[in-house]
Amino acid sequence: MPRQPTPQSSFPQLNISRRQGLTLLGASLLGGASWAQTGTPWATIEAKARGQKVFMNAWGGSDRTNAYLQWAAGEVSRRYGVQVEHVKLTDTAEAVKRVRSEKAAGKLTGGTVDVVWINGENFLTMKRESLLFGPFAESLPNFQYVDVVGKPTTRSDFSEPVEGLEAPWGMAQFTLYADRKRVPNPPRSMAALADFARANPGRVTYPRPPAFIGTTFLKQALLELNTDRSALYKPFTPEALARASAPLWAYLDALHPHLWRAGKQFPQTPAAIRQMMADGELMVTLTFNPNEAANEIVAKRQADSVYAWQMAGGSVGNTHFLAIPFNTGVAEGAQVLINFMLSPEAQARKADISIWGDPTVLAMDKLPAAERAQFGAKPLAGQVESPAPVILEPHGSWVDPLEREWLKRYGQ
């Protein structure tokens, strides 16, 4: 029987080949065939991929992202003869749960998830439970262009070594934006943001964790409020959480009464706070995409006077990745798709403010001149004016306990 897509799949039948890894022998026994593992020439991988169908599991909450994936589907179809179906997720954990269940049921090949857009705690879970195919990423032909020096999070996912088990796809960093006419002097630290909220009650908020940017807001505060961050980059322990999070809860206890609806309610999604900003309900808003304000200006949802900034002492940032589950039956098609996503052409289109505006993982100085020219060099209104240093994410094991403690304290 053919594999069936899970609910919420889109553009079905388009012709194209999205938080310790397996050993080479283990992956082989579980049904994968990888260039990295077998030494097979890339042309052979492409030939085997032709005619395969790939179920790509990726967050489906953005029209821009969905449209980009549809474009990529068409391109890979035309060039490589592989099919893809975008399985739209509301939470990446859905796909992780599905792969885990298949492994428990003994389904060691022909799984229902072929590619997953992933990082952080979800990657950590899949790596620890040997749910990932590979290593494969650093043997993809287009990996040669990845900026592994200037963007070290391309090899470290929430402080967990990637080890070739997922391929970097895009960059993210905690960013704020506001209308310069209303906020001429932006708050450039979490302490300054609290002062701003006190001076402008009801005009600041953040999404309710576990919404991603809400959790990122917690991590930014956690990192800024701890001068010794060493414990945050080690696997979570209850004792470490109690020590490190004490200043965070004190900060939030003082901040919440000055937030939107006095901190008794929180928006559910990033889209909700974007709309509140567009409506003038908020004076400052948060994002994990440094180009979001520019996107909003181009889409005529924000005024040209909107500008973006990051925290002066550094903003938490990471890379998001594409991974292949251990039990895919179409490893060749999955690798062809991911390799295309790493191409200068696909990365430049993804970085285009008018298309998506997701920052590239590539190093401009590694690209031939023609490919480098595809990336816009002129800054646009709303783009971050003075990018801050990246603060590495805490270890991925901190995310769930941090969210649970927030919900226990503030989620009622």
Regions found by a protein language model. Give the residues of each.
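Loop/turn elements at helix/coil->beta-strand transitions in domains of secreted/extracellular proteins
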Residues: 51-54, 82, 111-114, 200-203, ...
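Early extracytoplasmic/lumenal segment of secretory-pathway proteins
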Residues: 39-121
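Mature extracytoplasmic/periplasmic domains
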Residues: 315, 320-386
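N-terminal secretory signal peptides
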Residues: 1-16, 23-30
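Conserved C-terminal helix/tail region of periplasmic/extracytoplasmic solute-binding proteins
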Residues: 41, 275, 382-412
